[in-house]
Amino acid sequence: MFISTRLRVLGRRCRTAAFTLVELLVVIAIIGVLIGLLLPAIQAAREAGRRSSCGNNLRQLGLGLHNYESAKGKFPPGFQREYGSTTTNDGFSGAGAQGNWAWGSFILPYMEYATVAETLDMTGTTCAEAMANGTKAAAMKKRMPGFLCPSDATRPTGLTDINFNNAAGTNVGSGWAMSNYVAANNSGDTARNGDGMFFMDSEVKIKDITDGTTKTIALGERVWRNFNGVTGTDPGNSQTLSGSIKPQAGCVFCVRGTRQQSSWGIRDGLGAMPTGGGINKPSSIISYTESVSARSFCSSYHPGGAQCTMADGSTRFFSESTSLGVMRNLIAIADGQPVSGDY
């Protein structure tokens, strides 16, 4: 009798302690709400980590620039002119004209990529020759994390539309290591002789940056943006382009191939501030007659703006509200209009 009563009491306690279906649904709903509240915070924390890693990349690139400057007494050229077999005196007209090694290739020995620089032997090999050499080309196609922004998840493993031809005019392939960081070329459109730190055969010294190294941009971000089915006109040589137009981020090693005689061609490693440009502008490409999307910097997938390396090697974040005029003044190294105050 006593045992039977005790079992009934325990049974009632067990039934009372169990969840009802309604209670279970309430618990699930509460968990869902908590996840919904926490997820944005988790995503924001992850993006903060990616932005920090991106900033560290830019600082290391800035250190590479200054190590080069300490060794050579000048900053590396935006890109080095290469004369083709039938070029005229300017090194750009005629078959075989090429854009040679770009700024990124010159600082490799002063970063963690010294072995890549040794493989390429840039002092004795042109960029076109390296691309046609199996061993050197393989080195140029390896992913280089120090040149990539972790927030740009849209980028491919390598550039596929550089169309860099060798001296014989034969396409030498694709897949070259891309870079999310481009060098400041001009306060207007991209140009062979821009007013920024990096242009064709540039030899900018610290003393040339009269606006101040803390008030001059050296490098900035540029995301990969792929717009398919766009038809436009190359403003440099009036060749009509159609199909997949890709204003990609940049290339670690070189500027574009035989079209580098126009400002349209040197966009692969250099950035500028043409009319209509600005931080994360334009958000879409209309046509190459606009020319802005292919050349504008800076752009990123960091919420609210993009990061730049200043000429003194420091890194700073620029918001999307930063005006085009301010960005242009920050790119020009000696326009006599140094930007002051909070920008």
Regions found by a protein language model. Give the residues of each.
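N-terminal leader/signal peptides at the extreme start of proteins
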Residues: 1-21, 85-88
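Intrinsically disordered and other compositionally biased segments
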Residues: 7-9, 46, 285
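Surface-exposed loop/linker segments characteristic of extracytoplasmic
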Residues: 48-343
